[in-house]
Every structure is written in structure tokens, then in C-alpha cells.
């Protein structure tokens, strides 16, 4: 089968005909039906730190077409092996208000109009061979006052084994996904790449990987699609500010404008689950929004009243703290597509055979998250003998913080760390 592939250069596009099968290793079930465009990441096809509706599109496609694009490392590829933490901090302080992320785009989707929904399906992800994790000294992250000294660590990504040796003898599994992905806001003007919102953006949901689709409301003509902040792996919490930050050599996505679909807030579909999400500077309000979105989905999926959907939510929704470092903190909930499914993954309060566990509860979810995550960082530091900044970074890359019992006034947070990360 022959498909048309468009290669997009800085100033022009050239069409060539090639076999789709020869170009990618995407499974046949995920091969697109439209044209395939190639979009390299260059200074002409990327923006650093801002969304801006006035930015001219770098590529125009039809609904249902596929784009095989590249992304850059932070700050227009300036955060690469060899950069010191002092240099990384200066990139932030010299550009106040600007996010650190390099965004590929915008891509204009013909036919996408305000009120539509853009479906973004990830077909394939190929990261670069390295990643970085850093905390900027005394700035950002969950605990900037407790970590006034910063650190940057670079690591090789073993794409054959799909793991990286984060520390000597400590291996983190790779699960590549886009930290930032979304469309233009309805409001004009520049907007920092850091806070997420109704347009998606910096959602940092690690379950949004190959084979999953993001559905996001369209606010401007053409939708204007961007992506960046590419991750090789991330913990649920991303507490020290960064995941395993990388760039993608290939990010293969199909963009489809959906007509007649009502959606007010982003939602993700995986092969087995739907994922709802909530964002706010206050984690309590992010949690409240995630609950509302989950109840709304359960009502739609199972034809339930609002009261019945709220009652079902604790039995079927697996809710995690996506991140607490993007100005607006995030919580996402996984709901099984199987309507008969009941039960949620383990939420232990004490150590298990497979997991290190910390647990905290408080009427204020921000406090519960702070206490549970700091307890895990301290545990890794004191019990596993990991240096304090390394423990902070490892928690950001591999800790999984989950929302626990929802029945009482106190909120429960369970943070877990797989023991399998450590190899003797």
C-alpha cells in the first residue's frame, strides 16, 4: 500500500511517495489512513516556553493525517549533557515568565473549528539515547525550601532493555510519553508553557503513551497543535520538578477533528481505560475537579444519575497525583472500560513484598501529599543509603503517589516505590 508522505523543511514542503510500512514499525492496527507528514524540530518549527495563538502554523494538514515529528530538549536544546545546574538555573532566571519547554508546532488541522474535539492518537514514540533529571536550586519543585542546593544528572537510555541506570545499581523502567501536548487556548496572547488547562498542555500523565488517544476541546480555527517536554519516564508526583527529560527522535501522532462531540475538558483513552483529570494550584480543588469529571464520565458510560455515579466512583476509579510542580497541580483517575470491573490497585499503608510504602492523611490534600512524598524521600535516603538530592530525583522519576480512601473527611495519600529498582 502506497501512502503520501510530506517532508516539512524550514520554508517549504516537498511531497514524496513511500511505503508506510517501510517508514515505521507502527503495528498494522494503528497505521493511519491519511497522509503522513515529517516535521523536524528546528528553530523555525519550535517555540521556547510560550503558547501563542498568533504564531503562524509550521504545518497544515487535513483531519485524519499523521505527523511524524521531532522534539527538542529544554530551552531550544540547551539542556544537554555537559550543561551545569548553574547554567540551567540561569536559563530560567534570564527568561522570567517563560517556560523551559521547547514546543514543536503549531500544526493547523484543516476543518477543526471551535466547539469540535481534536483526537490525538499516539502511534509510536522513539526517544533520544539520553535523558536528564534536575532540580533548580531553591526554585520550583515541591520542596524548594528544603533543597536550596541543586543538582543535574544525565543518564543513558537503554532502548533495547527499556530502562536506565538512574544511580549505580538503581534501574528505572522507561515509559516514554509527552509531558506537554494540546491545542491553542481560546484567549489571545502569550501564555507560559508551564500551567495545564482545558486545552491540555503540560498535563504530565505518564499513562498517555503509545496506543492511547487524547481528546481535547478545540478553541480556535485549525486547533493549533503543539507538543514538547518529552519524557522517558516519570513518577506520579514529579516532585523535584523534572521527570527523565528527553527529546523524541520520532513522535508519531494522528490528528483527527471530531464533529458533533461534546467535551468541555480533556480526556484520555487507553486500550483498557478512560482517564479523567483535574488541575488547580490547590490540590484539593484539582481533586474535586477530577472527581466531577470522573462522575460525569461514569454517568455517560453507564447511564447513571449524578448521585449513583458519585457512589460508584470509589469502587472503580484509580486516582493518582500526576504532578505537583506545574503551578496548577494535577490529579488523574483511571476508569476501566469494562463496566463489570470492580476493585482498584493496591493502596497499602505499610511495606509489602514488592513495594516500599509511605502513607499520610490530612483534611488538606496538599498536606497529605507533602507528608507522604517527603516520608518516601527520607526513607530512600536513610534506609537505602541514597544521597539526599539523588533521593529527591529518584522519587520524581519513579515514586507513585495514589489517592486512598475517599469516604471520610481526611484525604489519604499512599506513595509507593518498587523494590525492583534496586539490583544487587
Regions found by a protein language model. Give the residues of each.
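Conserved mixed alpha/beta catalytic, RNA-binding, or beta-rich assembly cores of soluble enzyme
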Residues: 178-202, 206-284, 295, 341, ...
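Short, Lys/Arg- and Gly-enriched loop/turn segments at beta-strand edges
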Residues: 74-85, 125-135, 222-232, 323-325, ...
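Bacterial N-terminal signal peptides
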Residues: 8-17
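Short, compositionally biased
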Residues: 80-98, 130-145, 227-244, 347-350
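Short, structured beta-strand/loop micro-motifs enriched in basic residues and often containing a Trp
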Residues: 42-52, 96-104, 191-199
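N-terminal, Lys/Arg-enriched amphipathic/low-complexity engagement segments
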Residues: 29-95
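Intrinsically disordered, low-complexity linker/loop segments enriched in Gly/Pro
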Residues: 124-209
Amino acid at each position: 500500500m502506497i501512502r503520501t508522505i510530506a517532508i516539512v523543511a524550514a520554508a517549504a514542503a516537498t511531497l514524496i511517495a513511500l511505503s508506510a510500512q517501510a517508514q515505521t514499525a507502527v503495528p498494522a492496527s494503528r497505521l493511519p489512513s491519511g497522509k503522513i507528514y515529517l516535521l523536524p524540530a528546528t528553530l523555525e518549527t519550535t517555540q521556547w516556553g510560550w503558547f501563542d495563538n498568533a504564531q503562524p502554523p509550521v504545518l497544515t494538514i487535513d483531519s485524519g493525517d499523521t505527523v511524524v515529528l521531532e522534539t527538542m530538549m529544554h530551552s531550544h536544546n540547551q539542556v544537554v549533557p555537559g550543561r551545569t545546574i548553574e547554567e540551567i538555573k540561569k536559563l530560567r532566571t534570564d527568561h522570567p515568565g517563560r517556560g523551559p519547554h521547547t514546543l514543536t508546532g503549531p500544526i493547523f488541522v484543516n476543518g477543526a473549528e471551535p466547539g469540535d474535539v481534536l483526537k490525538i492518537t499516539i502511534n509510536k514514540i522513539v526517544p533520544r539515547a539520553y535523558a536528564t533529571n534536575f532540580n533548580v536550586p531553591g526554585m520550583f519543585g515541591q520542596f524548594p525550601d528544603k533543597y536550596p542546593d541543586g543538582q543535574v544528572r544525565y543518564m543513558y537510555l537503554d532502548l533495547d532493555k527499556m530502562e536506565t541506570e538512574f544511580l549505580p545499581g538503581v534501574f528505572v523502567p522507561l515509559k516514554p510519553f509527552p509531558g506537554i501536548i494540546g491545542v491553542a487556548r481560546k484567549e489571545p496572547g502569550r501564555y507560559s508553557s508551564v500551567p495545564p488547562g482545558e486545552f491540555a498542555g503540560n498535563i504530565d500523565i505518564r499513562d498517555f503513551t503509545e496506543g492511547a488517544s487524547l481528546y481535547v476541546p478545540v478553541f480556535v480555527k485549525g486547533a493549533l497543535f503543539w507538543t514538547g517536554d518529552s519524557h522517558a519516564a516519570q513518577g506520579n508526583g514529579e516532585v523535584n520538578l523534572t521527570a527523565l527529560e528527553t527529546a523524541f527522535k520520532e513522535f508519531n501522532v494522528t490528528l483527527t477533528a471530531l464533529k458533533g462531540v461534546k467535551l468541555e475538558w480533556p480526556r484520555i483513552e487507553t486500550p483498557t481505560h478512560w482517564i479523567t483529570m483535574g488541575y488547580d494550584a490547590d490540590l484539593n480543588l484539582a481533586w474535586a475537579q477530577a472527581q466531577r469529571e470522573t462522575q460525569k464520565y461514569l454517568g455517560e458510560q453507564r447511564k447513571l444519575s449524578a448521585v449513583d455515579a458519585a457512589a460508584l466512583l470509589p469502587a472503580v476509579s484509580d486516582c493518582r497525583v500526576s504532578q505537583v510542580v506545574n503551578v496548577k497541580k494535577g490529579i488523574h483517575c483511571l476508569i476501566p472500560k469494562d463496566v463489570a470491573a470492580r476493585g482498584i490497585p493496591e493502596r497499602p499503608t505499610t511495606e509489602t513484598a514488592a513495594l516500599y510504602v509511605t502513607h499520610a492523611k490530612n483534611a488538606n490534600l496538599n498536606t497529605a501529599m507533602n507528608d507522604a512524598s517527603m516520608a518516601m524521600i527520607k526513607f530512600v535516603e536513610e534506609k537505602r543509603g541514597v544521597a539526599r538530592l539523588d533521593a529527591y530525583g529518584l522519587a520524581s522519576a519513579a515514586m507513585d503517589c495514589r489517592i486512598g480512601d475517599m469516604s471520610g473527611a481526611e484525604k489519604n495519600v499512599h506513595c509507593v516505590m518498587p523494590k525492583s529498582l534496586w539490583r544487587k
